[in-house]
């Protein structure tokens, strides 16, 4: 009897992996598609080498907006609202999306258009930086993300009256940074961190959870988490901003503030986002909901 159940379960899994569907990537849920993280990292560094590092001019005290997990299919209503508020706020400087930008095959261009500047709706052309999430890899989505959005690992600067701050986007979409990205991060922080007032890390998968709640695209291995915690403490990282789990959490550990931002997905009762004001004193948070 047990053998029959196991056989039927295996056949069902095989059918799910082989079936074609534009809404659910069963194969990707169990085994995320697209290139592995080391390959994405190498491609991202190559792309970074062909373009200048983005630099935003701001006051010593500046504000930016953060949202995550819009899971765009054909409905962009909450994302549109977020972008409209951001680009009409005279106190803002830029925005960040922490991954899981899409939830359906071929929707990366829909997401790109939704976060694009619209002269008839927006007063300011603030940039919005995008982080890659596990859902962005489904349906062989890395090619779309790379071609439509850009690299999954990159950094940008905010230049202000007292120098510069650095923001580093890490690719954790497979539930790991991978050996090559970890090695690069150690070397990059050792060589570059001292040039900046504040260092802020943005990534999709939160590094403090180890329950592997979302299978192969779940949470980061314990050994990697410990290495990142030590690295961020050592190099005085101010914030580590994360998404993925669709709930809010705010923890400070060893002087580093680790924040999970809740989802902005339109189906939820209270789609939320976060406004952060950065100054020489640190960071102040203002939680908001999409109206």
Residue ranges of each PLM-predicted region?
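Hydrophobic beta-strand anchors of alpha/beta hydrolase catalytic cores
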Residues: 64, 95, 167, 199-200
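Extended active-site neighborhood of metal-dependent phosphoesterases/phosphodiesterases
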Residues: 34-51, 107-198, 218-234, 239, ...
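C-terminal motif of bacterial Sec signal peptides marking the signal peptidase cleavage site
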Residues: 17-20
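Active-site glycine-centered loops adjacent to acidic/histidine catalytic or metal-binding residues
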Residues: 69, 99-100, 133-134, 204, ...
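Short acidic, glycine-rich surface-loop motifs adjacent to enzyme active sites
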Residues: 192-212
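Histidine-centered catalytic micro-motifs
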Residues: 200-207, 238-248
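Bacterial N-terminal signal peptides that target proteins for export
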Residues: 1-10
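N-terminal active-site segment of His-dependent metallophosphoesterases
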Residues: 22-109
């Amino acid at each position: 009897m047990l053998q029959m159940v196991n056989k039927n379960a295996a056949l069902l899994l095989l059918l799910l992996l082989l079936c074609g569907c534009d809404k659910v990537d069963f194969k990707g849920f169990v085994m995320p598609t697209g290139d592995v993280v080391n390959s994405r990292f190498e491609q991202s560094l190559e792309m970074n080498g062909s373009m200048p590092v983005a630099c935003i001019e701001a006051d010593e005290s500046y504000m930016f907006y953060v949202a995550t997990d819009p899971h765009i299919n054909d409905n962009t209503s909450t994302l549109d609202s977020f972008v409209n508020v951001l680009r009409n706020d005279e106190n803002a400087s830029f925005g960040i999306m922490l991954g899981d930008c899409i939830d359906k095959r071929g929707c990366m261009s829909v997401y790109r258009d939704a976060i694009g500047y619209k002269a008839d709706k927006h007063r300011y052309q603030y940039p919005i930086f995008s982080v890659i999430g596990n859902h962005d890899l489904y349906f062989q989505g890395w090619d779309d993300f790379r071609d439509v959005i850009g690299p999954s690992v990159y950094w940008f600067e905010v230049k202000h009256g007292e120098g510069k701050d650095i923001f580093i986007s890490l690719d954790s979409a497979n539930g790991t940074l991978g050996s090559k990205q970890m090695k690069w991060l150690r070397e990059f922080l050792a060589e570059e961190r001292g040039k900046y007032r504040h260092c802020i890390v943005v990534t999709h998968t939160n590094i403090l959870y180890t329950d592997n709640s979302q299978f192969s695209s779940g949470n980061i291995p314990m050994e990697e988490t410990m290495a990142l915690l030590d690295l961020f403490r050592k190099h005085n990282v101010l914030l580590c901003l994360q998404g993925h789990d669709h709930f809010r959490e705010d923890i400070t550990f060893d002087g580093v503030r680790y924040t999970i931002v809740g989802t902005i997905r339109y189906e939820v009762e209270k789609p939320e986002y976060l406004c952060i004001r950065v100054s020489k004193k640190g960071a102040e948070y203002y939680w908001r909901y999409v109206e």
